[in-house]
């Protein structure tokens, strides 16, 4: 199966990216799928058009993170969106067959405008970003797209665009399927939505000492005011982190019973979480160190991967132009 997914370079990778996306990407890669993973730098401009000072830095950091987490350039194509100009051409052509009213009905359009109400998002680029997203997927004829639940609607719109193009012109595009992550979104360390603006994220490159300090300060079930007060793990962000960091069945039972009967304290629970987090993050930290030993490695990966992606995209665009009688 051909797989495609991407991330916007709007900051450092954090553990939400790891458990919500990157682990699934690696799994799909190791299952032998043909995987295309990219940095969506054009998509970053839809909400960060007014500050591009760190765009290049964040793009390279994202690729470093992909590599450190296990994306293998020998098995997957790793590329940068803006390096494949065919994405923009296909998005332009798709924009001819999608109505403005259809784009205004995309749920995330209003949600993001409301969430970022301090920014002027009344731009054409922000309105049509789902069209560019459809072009990102369809230009590689992807059959599967790993996404979170909040992106399923975008995959359905992509399927609609593929159907409409195939009906109007020629059978060029498959209809991709959403591949949902098994892990729900992690909350921030304070229990709220994980967000840089809240200061409640844990960066992947956090030091071991900082990780310990952060986890030990994490918010827990408000009902556990005293050590002797029983709690409910379902109301505790630490419990949600346990589920994401490979807690064993025996450990899970120990945490659940210990919390609900107050036979263990929150610090005991957090120490177990720390042990499991360090076990998962230690190889990633080591990979970052090895990657940084060669200052040219990341750029070489980007260059080679973008070249491979461009070759595939160019073939698709030949079919598209032929179907639309644009062969001049």
Swiss-Prot record:
Q: What is its EC number?
A: 6.1.1.2
Which compartments is it annotated to reside in?
A: Cytoplasm
Entry annotated with the keyword Thylakoid? no
- InterPro entries the UniProt entry points to: aa-tRNA-synth_I_CS, aa-tRNA-synth_Ic, Rossmann-like_a/b/a_fold, Trp-tRNA-ligase, Trp-tRNA-ligase_bac-type, Trp-tRNA_synthetase
Q: Which reaction does it catalyse?
A: tRNA(Trp) + L-tryptophan + ATP = L-tryptophyl-tRNA(Trp) + AMP + diphosphate + H(+)
'HIGH' region (motif): residue ranges: 9-17
Q: Which GO terms describe its molecular function?
A: ATP binding; tryptophan-tRNA ligase activity
**Lineage from the top down?**
Bacteria, Thermotogati, Thermotogota, Thermotogae, Thermotogales
Name a GO CC annotation attached to this entry: cytoplasm
Residues recorded as binding ATP, renumbered to this chain, are 8-10, 16-17, 148-150, 186, 193-197
Q: List the disulfide bonds.
A: none
Q: Where is this motif: 'KMSKS' region?
A: 193-197
Protein name (record)? Tryptophan--tRNA ligase
Where L-tryptophan is bound, by residue? 136
Q: How does it assemble?
A: Homodimer.
